[in-house]
């Protein structure tokens, strides 16, 4: 056996989530599901509220991480109050979410998880069947009858999907001061031809949807702060001035339809639904509203560098720091990932205590994206490594960088299970409409079909499957908003795609993995060459919302390294598996020996799904010497390099058996090599290749004394998808004097700033590893 089992009168805010979904042409967060391209759903007719039921308004308040969640607050009898969590159920949560215009509730939370509210606790012991038109129709102890405290305030998490055609009840709107924005949808409509032709749309009228009608907003009370919020929602970090004269000319040509109200934002809101309702343009919203001495409100947004239609963006210097101080890691899509901050030359994570939309939006804008769509907690985008630099971050929303916010530098009580992440709003680039999956068993898989221009016409066709790999598949899944790639298929004869797309129109695709679109990858252009040809060899993908993330424990490598002079007669299995250098063939089998650089490697899965071998069990290889199956021919590379990067020796470990050696906390082991067991590494577990197992070495018999780099690369050929490939390389400085070896400064690539990386060759913390004679 080779292995060792390795969260009074209150007249503020008022409710409603505004823009959970935007039209497909304006916003690119839609899943590429077939149902999104079917006929529009019929208009929703809200159930009648019985005449004897009190009229109320609801809102979601508190420390929110998404605009569609928060503490449930009820406006009744001239006051805002809360709801107690006693006897609250998912049925009551459904009623709340539907009253707010969402399709359903995803969950509900107890014990003031969004912070304690103020004012009366209006409802206690609420019982709903789930079919009620309003929370006021559910049974309860009665208005204000409760024995609860605000530590028991209930919250809900609503689905972001809106009820089609939902109309808000504005009957109480004039009786509530500081009411929040209440509209079904919002958009930026390009007016000038120059902007209509651009992608993304960066300038135009701000329009809101009421029923089936899009209406303009009067600019009489419009401010730059309003523009900042709107631009942020559409994926832009900032706003700028525009030519008012040309818009006056356009407004004079056509009669406008104005929304009866105005907006009042502070500029720090992540979502327009958090802005307050501004002064009314007309006291009688029923009549045709005019904008006296005014024009339709216009926004002109500044895109980040990645999304600029004219090359490098000209946005303010604040968005272009000379050295990035924050980065995102482990996200499937552009503008999302675990937040990592550079401090004292080392990258570290952010603890999710007090992490909310305001702080997350500061990160997003700093990186050239819009406001935050979601502040993610609980290491849902994978665990980081290294220090936790920031804790209990509290931003006002006006900061240029996350490091300008108030925070606690102490990370006591935090661990990497609490790493904070963000999902930012990004501009609609239209990439999703140029790619589709067909023939799969579910919307996450299928044959890849691309839209290309041929002879002046747009046609759909296949992608040649030759040399198609997981990196190319990752770009496809990202472009479609379907997460990570779990598989890349070079043959898709078993999937029946669109019969009108059976011709190969793209070949020679080679991606780096960072592209926003498959069209951005290198390919043959119109000179399509697919040797195998035919429908059989069209490229395909399977996508997944989660992925594993393997990271090597650098400290264990450094601590376990030593030299061993091992006799040739003890290396018969190693010879069979080609684990020795070529010169071993000339070594005397009885008296000769090989000098081996031995070490242990502990490989952790810090991702959000299990790491499974690329090949199925039918393709595993039996190794008689080790008496078990190996599931991956190439899992890691072990290399000794000159300081100029030239390889002088390499590990020749032929293949690997993957299993769970140990796991964190109460996580159960799922994989083992023995008895033809399933192989892989469970999330939260690690696989330990001990220094004393066969082939766990680099044969340095022919290496002269000197200074070297020792490098370990996990999953070097990208055979299995991971959420982050940047942490797959570990490097150590190595000094070998012919008898002893020193291994020091072992670290994972990308853990330090570029400046610090350049200094890591300085001799410090040396470990003296003597030669071990056997």
From Swiss-Prot:
Signal peptide segment? 1-25
Species name for this entry? Bos taurus
Carrying 2',4',5'-topaquinone, the residues are: 689
Q: How is its activity regulated?
A: Specifically inhibited by a mouse monoclonal antibody AB0023, inhibition occurs in a non-competitive manner.
Q: What is its main location?
A: secreted
Which residues of the sequence carry a binding annotation for Cu cation? Answer: 626, 628, 630
Q: What keywords does the record list, in alphabetical order?
A: Basement membrane, Calcium, Chromatin regulator, Chromosome, Copper, Disulfide bond, Endoplasmic reticulum, Extracellular matrix, Glycoprotein, LTQ, Metal-binding, Nucleus, Oxidoreductase, Repeat, Repressor, Secreted, Signal, TPQ, Transcription, Transcription regulation
Q: Which InterPro entries match?
A: LOX-like_protein, Lysyl_oxidase, Lysyl_oxidase_CS, SRCR, SRCR-like_dom_sf
The answer to keyword Ubl conjugation applying to this record is: no
All disulfide bonds of the chain are: 84-148, 97-158, 128-138, 218-291, 231-301, 265-275, 351-414, 364-424, 395-405, 464-530, 477-543, 511-521, 573-625, 579-695, 657-673, 663-685, 732-746
Any one of the GO CC terms:
nucleus
GO terms (molecular function) for this protein are:
calcium ion binding; copper ion binding; oligosaccharide binding; protein-lysine 6-oxidase activity
**Domain remark text:** The fourth SRCR domain plays an important role in optimizing the catalytic activity of the lysyl-oxidase like (LOX) catalytic domain.
The molecule here is called: Lysyl oxidase homolog 2
PANTHER family attached to this UniProt entry: LYSYL OXIDASE HOMOLOG 2 (PTHR45817:SF1), LYSYL OXIDASE-LIKE-RELATED (PTHR45817)
Family assignment?
Answer: Belongs to the lysyl oxidase family.
């Amino acid at each position: 056996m080779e292995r060792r089992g390795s969260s009074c009168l209150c007249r503020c805010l008022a409710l409603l989530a505004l823009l959970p979904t935007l039209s497909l042409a304006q916003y690119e967060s839609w899943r590429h599901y077939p149902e999104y391209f079917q006929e529009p759903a019929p208009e929703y007719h809200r159930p009648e509220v019985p005449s004897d039921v009190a009229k109320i308004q609801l809102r979601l308040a508190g420390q929110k991480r998404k605009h569609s969640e928060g503490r449930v607050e009820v406006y009744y009898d001239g006051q805002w109050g809360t709801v107690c969590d006693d006897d609250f159920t998912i049925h009551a949560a459904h009623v709340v979410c539907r009253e707010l215009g969402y399709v359903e509730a995803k969950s509900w939370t107890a014990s003031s998880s969004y912070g304690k509210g103020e004012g009366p606790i209006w409802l206690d012991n609420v019982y709903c069947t789930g079919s009620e038109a309003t929370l006021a129709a559910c049974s309860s102890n009665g208005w204000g009858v409760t024995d609860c405290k605000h530590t028991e305030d209930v919250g809900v998490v609503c689905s972001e999907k809106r009820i089609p055609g939902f109309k808000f009840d504005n009957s109480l709107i004039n009786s509530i001061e500081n009411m929040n924005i209440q509209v079904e949808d919002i958009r930026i409509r390009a007016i000038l031809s120059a902007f209509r032709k651009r992608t993304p749309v960066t300038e135009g009228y701000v329009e809101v949807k009421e029923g089936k009608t899009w209406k303009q907003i009067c600019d009489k009370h419009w401010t730059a702060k309003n523009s900042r919020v709107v631009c942020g929602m559409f994926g832009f970090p900032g706003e700028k001035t525009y030519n008012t004269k040309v818009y006056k000319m356009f407004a004079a040509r056509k009669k406008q339809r104005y929304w009866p109200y105005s907006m009042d934002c502070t500029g720090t809101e992540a979502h327009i639904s958090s802005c307050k309702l501004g002064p009314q343009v007309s006291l009688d919203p029923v009549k045709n509203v005019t904008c006296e001495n005014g024009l339709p409100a216009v926004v002109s947004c500044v895109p980040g560098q990645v999304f600029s239609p004219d090359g490098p963006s000209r946005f303010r210097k604040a968005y272009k720091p000379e050295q990035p101080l924050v980065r995102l890691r482990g996200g499937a899509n552009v503008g999302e990932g675990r937040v990592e901050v550079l401090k004292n030359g080392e990258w570290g994570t952010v603890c999710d205590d007090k992490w909310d939309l305001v702080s997350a939006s500061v990160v997003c804008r700093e990186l050239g994206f819009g406001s935050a769509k979601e502040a993610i907690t609980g290491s849902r985008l994978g665990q980081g490594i290294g220090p936790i630099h920031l804790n209990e971050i509290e931003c006002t929303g006006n900061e240029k960088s996350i490091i300008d916010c108030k925070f606690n530098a102490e990370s006591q009580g935090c661990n990497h299970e609490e790493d904070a992440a963000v999902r930012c709003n990004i501009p609609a680039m239209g990439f999703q409409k140029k790619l589709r999956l067909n023939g799969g068993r579910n919307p996450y898989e299928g044959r890849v079909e691309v839209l290309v221009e041929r002879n002046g016409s747009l046609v759909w066709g296949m992608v040649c499957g030759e040399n198609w790999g997981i990196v190319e598949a990752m770009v496809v899944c990202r472009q479609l908003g379907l997460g990570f790639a779990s598989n890349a298929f070079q043959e898709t004869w078993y999937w029946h795609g669109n019969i009108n797309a059976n011709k190969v129109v793209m070949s020679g695709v080679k991606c780096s993995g960072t592209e926003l679109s498959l069209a951005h990858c290198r390919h043959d252009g119109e000179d399509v060459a697919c040797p195998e040809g035919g429908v059989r060899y069209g490229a395909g993908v399977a996508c997944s919302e989660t992925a594993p993330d393997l990271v090597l424990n650098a400290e264990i490598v450094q601590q376990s390294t030593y030299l061993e002079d091992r006799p040739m007669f003890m290396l018969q299995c190693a010879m069979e598996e080609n684990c020795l250098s070529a010169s071993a063939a000339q070594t005397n089998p009885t008296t000769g020996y090989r000098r081996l650089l031995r070490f242990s490697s502990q490989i952790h899965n810090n991702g959000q799904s299990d790491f499974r071998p690329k090949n199925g069990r039918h393709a595993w290889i039996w190794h008689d010497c080790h008496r078990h199956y190996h599931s991956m021919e190439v899992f890691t590379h072990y290399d000794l390099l000159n300081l100029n990067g030239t390889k002088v020796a390499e590990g020749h470990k032929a293949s690997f058996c993957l299993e769970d050696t140990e796991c964190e906390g109460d996580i159960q082991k799922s994989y083992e090599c023995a008895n033809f067991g399933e192989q892989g590494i469970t999330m939260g577990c690690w696989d330990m290749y001990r220094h004393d197992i066969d082939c766990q070495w680099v044969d340095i018999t022919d290496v002269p004394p000197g200074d070297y780099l020792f490098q370990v690369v996990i999953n070097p050929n990208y055979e299995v998808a991971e959420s982050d490939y940047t942490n797959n390389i570990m490097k150590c400085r190595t000094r070998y004097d012919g008898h002893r070896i020193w291994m020091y400064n072992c670290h994972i690539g990308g853990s330090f700033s570029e400046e610090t990386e350049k200094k890591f060759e300085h001799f410090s913390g040396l470990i003296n590893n003597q030669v071990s004679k056997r």
